[in-house]
A protein has these predicted regions:
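Active-site environment of divalent metal-dependent phosphoester hydrolases
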Residues: 26-28, 57-60, 91-103, 152-155, ...
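N-terminal active-site segment of His-dependent metallophosphoesterases
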Residues: 1-77
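Extended active-site neighborhood of metal-dependent phosphoesterases/phosphodiesterases
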Residues: 2-9, 66-175, 221, 264-270
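Surface-exposed cleft-lining segments at the edges of enzyme active sites
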Residues: 24-25, 59, 64-65, 151-160, ...
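Divalent metal-coordination and catalytic microenvironments
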Residues: 22, 37, 49, 54, ...
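His/acidic metal-ligating clusters that form di-metal
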Residues: 44-48, 143-146, 157-234, 302, ...
Length: 322
């Protein structure tokens, strides 16, 4: 990969991914965000970090006032923990990144300039590509698709992935059938079909269903989709044999689940191709019981993010209303 790190299973047959999402940092990064990021890396010791969008608090006016250099500075701060530890990482984008005034394509070029960023030059939208994980013989044994799930809203609603992204995905999915996992920012509409999972906030998926889930299901080798976007959600459900999961937000410059912010560790085994294990590593468990800002933590924990502002359980009785 043009001198970039080579991704392969460890000698013990495992491969570990740390999924981080919604850091949403501005021009002055929050200390708690960096504490969590460093603790996640030291605790998980992953083979790969996947960032699934909203790395930037793009709606902050400071980015547009200060220009591209401010974006570069923030991205440098957020990627330095991986760079210092020589941990490969890959990046896709959310709905807020482009709001900083710098296009996702320009941001992707900034990321690619760092030695341990393994994002290839995209064939379609920035943030849309796949990564091969090889076994000891050099053969591809596992694949991760990173998808640009869209960053624009239409009449106040989230737009689905662009047609060109779906065409690319369809082409790649059916070239080979490799055990795979998908990472993107915005959840699929099918997340609303998950049963017996705890909702900590409303599922904010596109109103228009463009058939992405059907493509993944028809491939037959997709284990799961993991996303962010809805900062407090952290469930893993299942629809038609595909796990649909959330990772809670990892940033402290936006709303979130208080000291339960964190990242998701995923462990794969070379001899169990369609099997994985996962757990959420939380700030309160790996950094400290409370954050450095107890007032914000209180409001994060007690302010409702969906009406009627309570934890909901999706099951067969209320599925149609979810």
């Amino acid at each position: 990969m043009n001198g970039k790190p080579y991704l392969e299973f460890r000698e013990d047959g495992t491969f570990q991914v740390l999924h981080i999402t919604d850091l949403q940092e501005g021009v002055h990064s929050k200390k708690d965000t960096l504490r969590l990021l460093n603790a996640l890396l030291d605790t998980a010791k992953p083979d790969l970090v996947i960032l699934t969008g909203d790395q930037l608090k793009g709606y902050s006016p400071a980015f547009r006032l200060l220009g591209k250099e401010s974006v570069q500075n923030t991205l440098h701060i957020l990627t330095e923990p991986m760079e210092k530890r020589c941990i490969p990482y890959a990046v896709t984008f959310g709905n807020h990144d482009v709001q900083c005034g710098i296009s996702n394509e320009e941001q992707a070029a900034i990321y690619r300039s760092y030695p341990y960023c393994i994002c290839p030059a995209e064939e379609q939208a920035a943030g849309t590509f796949y990564l091969k994980i090889r076994n000891s013989s050099g053969a591809e044994a596992l694949r991760f698709y990173l998808i640009d799930s869209g960053n624009q809203t239409v009449h106040g609603q989230y737009a689905p992935p662009a047609p060109a992204v779906l065409d690319w995905l369809k082409e790649k999915l059916f070239q080979d059938q490799i055990p795979s996992m998908v990472f993107q920012h915005i959840p699929l509409p099918e997340y609303k079909k998950c049963r017996n999972v705890t909702l900590k906030e409303r599922i904010c998926s596109p109103e228009k269903n463009v058939g992405e889930f059907e493509l993944l299901r028809d491939n037959g080798k997709i284990m799961a989709v993991f996303c962010g976007h809805d900062h407090k959600n952290d469930f893993v459900g299942q629809v038609d044999g595909i796990d649909l999961g959330y990772t809670p937000s990892g940033g402290f410059a936006c709303y979130g689940p208080g000291a339960e912010r964190g990242g998701r560790l995923l462990t794969f085994h070379v001899d169990r191709s369609m099997h994985y294990e996962t757990k959420v590593l939380r700030y309160c468990d790996i950094v400290a019981p409370h954050t450095g800002n107890r007032i914000k933590e209180f409001f994060d924990t007690h302010t409702p993010t969906c009406w009627p502002g309570r934890t909901e359980l999706i099951d067969e009785e209320n599925l149609e209303n979810a």
